[in-house]
């Protein structure tokens, strides 16, 4: 079994070092964020989950310029939609710029247009809804963590740059002194530049940080017993999670059945 240390993930005894490193990382790349997007500074993606709440708190503590954005996927749990609205109202009162971006098409409309549902290997919904970036050359920051899955352990690091919109020639760096200079030098020419301050946090570190900072979290975790905050019936969720969501939100199940019937009918009409 690969240990957290081998994966470069902080264990629960590393909380102080983890938060200090995260804030240092945010401060280090603020000049880059301001040069690429002077109006907004960093653009911080907010989903309404625990990781996102930790991320915004770290940005507030760092004292840098940033804008928080939330992409309305049209498939979020209603409680999450209300929670995001509440947090944005609170942060806006503190002078933090917050933006909710609504898509041109809903999830249902996109599926009808494509005549298919998303699945694990073709998650077009993420590309068009969840991962939409309104400011192409900004420095983005997300609350992704390597400990969330084996896939993220292999892909996600503190600094990510990609040379083209199609994400070719991916450059991934850990936040250390040798990588810091290279990342700063490269970022001015790369279209895609992301800072992930909590990429190396374990779930234990995240939960200890929430307790230490007394952070408010989305009520869905306690109310529904969920482990994740995301779209209802997401193909990346486990079968167990999707079955539980189907029981909790039967109205969405009916809509999915309607969608499947409509897609099947439109395909038959084309044939």
Predicted regions and their residues:
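Nucleotide-activated chemistry modules centered on ATP-dependent adenylation/adenylyltransferase
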Residues: 1-271
């Amino acid at each position: 079994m690969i240990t957290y240390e081998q994966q470069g993930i902080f264990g629960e005894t590393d909380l102080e070092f983890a938060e200090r490193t995260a804030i240092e990382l945010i401060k280090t790349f603020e000049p880059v964020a301001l040069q690429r997007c002077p109006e907004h500074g960093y653009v911080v993606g907010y989903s309404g989950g625990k990781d996102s709440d930790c991320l915004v708190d770290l940005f507030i503590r760092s004292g840098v310029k940033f804008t928080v954005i939330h992409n309305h996927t049209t498939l979020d749990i209603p409680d999450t939609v209300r929670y995001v609205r509440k947090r944005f109202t609170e942060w806006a009162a503190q002078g933090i710029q917050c933006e909710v971006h609504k898509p041109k098409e809903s999830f249902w409309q996109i599926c009808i247009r494509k005549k298919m549902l998303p699945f694990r290997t073709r998650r077009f919904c993420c590309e068009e809804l969840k991962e939409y970036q309104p400011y192409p050359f900004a420095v983005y920051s997300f609350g992704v963590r390597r400990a969330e899955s084996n896939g993220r352990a292999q892909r996600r690091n503190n600094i990510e740059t990609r040379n083209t919109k199609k994400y070719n020639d991916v450059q991934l760096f850990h936040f250390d002194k040798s990588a810091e200079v290279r990342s700063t030098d490269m970022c001015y020419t790369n279209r895609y530049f992301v800072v992930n301050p909590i990429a190396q946090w374990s779930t234990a570190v995240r939960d200890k940080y929430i307790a230490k900072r007394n952070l408010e979290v989305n009520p869905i975790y306690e109310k529904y017993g969920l482990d994740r905050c995301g779209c209802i019936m997401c193909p990346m969720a486990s079968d167990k999670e999707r079955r539980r969501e189907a029981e909790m939100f039967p109205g969405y199940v009916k809509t999915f059945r309607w969608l499947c019937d409509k897609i099947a009918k439109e395909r038959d009409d084309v044939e």
